[in-house]
Amino acid sequence: MCGIVGYIGPKQAAPLILEALKKLEYRGYDSSGIAIADGTKLGVVKAKGRLSVLEEMTDGGRSLPGCLGIGHTRWATHGEPNDVNAHPHLSQHGDVALVHNGIVENYIELRDFLTEQGYSFMSETDTEIAANLVEHLYRSNREDGPEAAIREALSLISGAFALGIIFADHPDTLYAVRKDSPLIVGVGKGENFIASDVPAILKHTRQVIRLDEYDMAVLTAGSVKIYNRYGEELHKNIEHIQWDADAAEKGGYPHFMLKEIMEQPDVIRNTVRPRIKEGAIDLGLYHISAEDIRACDRIFIVACGSASYVGQVAKHYIERYTRIPVTVELASEFRYSNPIVTDRTIAIVISQSGETIDTLFALREAKKRGAHVLSIVNVVGSTIANESEDVIYTWAGPEIAVATTKAYSAQLSVCYLLALYMGHCRHMVSDGELKSCLNAIEELPGLMRGLLEKSDYIKYLASLHFSCRNIYFIGRNIDHALALEGSLKLKEISYIFSEAYPAGELKHGTISLIEPGSLVVALCTYSPLTEKMISNMREVKARGAVVLALATEGTPGVEETADQVMWIPKTDPFVLPSLAILPLQLFAYYVALLKGCDIDKPRNLAKSVTVE
C-alpha cells in the first residue's frame, strides 16, 4: 500500500527522499508528500498525482533545505485522493509531522477526544488524527520527550500502522514505530533511514533492521536505538541484503512486468534447485515434521488474489498425492468464517510480500485455533514469515510490477515440491514417481525459456483482441484455476472486464452473456477433459463467440474448433500449469500495452496490501 521513507544524516534530505520514493512506486499510490525539518520549523509539501508533480513543486527537493525528513506515497483508504489528504500530516501547532501506512480503527473516538482538547481537522484522514494525538501528548508532558508521547499514543491507537515521525524542536532525530504494517531501518555510515521496503534505500545501504510488533526506532545521524513498547532497549540483528539495486531496475525492458515475465525460467531454477538433493526434496522444515504431515486430516490454503489462485492449483496436487482434503480460503474471509481447525490441521499461507494484512490476520486465527502454520513467502524476515511455524522462501527476488508474474510462478513451483514432499511423507508417492516429477521440474526452465521466445505471436493475437469490451476465460479442473489467474492478469492491467468460469458451468447461466463478437479464452491443457472442452468451445462459437484456445501441442480437435490457438510444449503434465500461465501473462501484457495502460502501476491497485 502506502510507501514510507525517512532520512537523517549530513545530506540534504528532500532530494534523497524523493529519489527513494520512486523505488516504492510499485506499491501503488495516488498522491505523495514530503516533510523536512530545517532547524526551526517543519516544512510540508504535498500533491495529488505522480511523484513528478511533487518534484516540480519542490524543484527536485532543493526548495526544502534540511537534513531530516520523511516522505510518503499514499493509496487512499480514509478520504479521497487530493492534496489535503496526502501525507505527511502536520499537527495543528506545527510541532509534529507524521506519515502513516495502515488504518486507525478508533479514529472517531480519538477525533472526538482531540476536538474536546481544542483541535480541529483539515483533512478527512485518520492520519491527521494520529499526528495531532502525538502533538497533544507531547505538549502535555514535554519534559518526558517525544518517545514518551509516541509510546502513549500507541497505547491509545487501535489498528494497523507503520509511522514515521519528526518533531520541529528535535531536528536531529527521526522516529519510527510499527504494528501489523511493515517498516525497516536502514543503517548507514553517518546516516540512517526508514522505509517500507528495501528497494527504497538499497542505493545507500545494504544493512537493514526489520522492526517487529510495537518496536520503536530512534535514529540520529550516528546512532540507531530500538525500544519495545515498554521503553526497554532491544538489540536487533542487522540483516545484510544480498541482492543489489540493479535487480530492482528494468534491465532494458520497457516495463518491469515484461522483465519479470522473462525472468521466470531463472526464478524457477533458483527456487527449486537448492531444494532437490540427490533425488529427494529438502524444504528446510524444522518444526512441522513428517509425523505431523502423516497425522494431518485437513489442510487450509489461505491467500489473497493471485496467491489464492496458486492455492487452487496446489489443492489439486496436494489432494492427488496425499489424499488429505484441502480447502482454499480467501484470507479476508477465513478469519470471519469460524473455520473448523484442530491441532491436526495444517494451514498453508501464501504471500509474496509476507505483509498482506488479511493473510497475516488469517495466519494468527489459524494459530490461535491450534493449526500448524506453514508460509510460502518471497520477502525474507517479513511478518508472515516470522510468525509462521515454518516458512518456505520462494527466492524470486524483488518484484516491482503490481501485477505478479514471477512470484506467482515461484509460489507454484514451491507447491509442486510441497505436494510431492507431503505425499512421500505419507508413503503415497513412490520413489519412482518422485524421480519422474523432479526430472520434469528440473527441465521446466528450459521449456519456459523456449516458450517465451515465441512471444511475438502472442503480441499478434493481442493486436486482434485489444479492443474487446468483455473477455471470458473458461477451463476445467486445473485449467479453471489457471483461467482465474489469466483473467485477473488481464483485468488488472488492461481494465477490460473479464471473468473466469468453470467451463461446465456455462450452460447454467453464464452462456447468456455470450453474444456475437465475444472473446472466449478456452484453456485445454488437461487431457482427460479435452473432449468436453471442445464441446464447450463449440457451444460458445454457436452463439457467435470468437474462441482463442490455449492447448498443449498435438491436442486433437482444438485447431479445428478454435479461431486461434496459443500452443504450449507437450511435456510431463505435472508441470503444465507453469507453462500454461506464460501465454496468459504475455497476452495480458500486450493487450494493456496496445491500450496504452500504465502496466507497472495500474490504477487503484497496490503491490503490498497492508490494510484490511
Outline where the language-model segments fall.
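Glycine-rich, anion-gripping cofactor-binding loops and their flanking helix/strand elements
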Residues: I184-R210, S332-A366, E505-K541, T571-Q585, ...
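Glycine-rich phosphate-binding loops that contact phosphosugars or nucleotide phosphates
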Residues: E291-E443, L523-M566, F587
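Glycine-rich oxoanion-binding loops at beta->alpha junctions
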Residues: C67, G71-V84, K277-E291, K315-I350, ...
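Active-site phosphate/pyrophosphate-binding segments
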Residues: Q264-I268, V272-F300, D390-L519, A592-E612
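Generic C-terminus detector
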Residues: G231, V546, E559-T561, T571-E612
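Conserved short alpha-helical segments that host acidic/polar catalytic motifs at enzyme active sites
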Residues: M1-K250, P254, D266-D297, Y336, ...
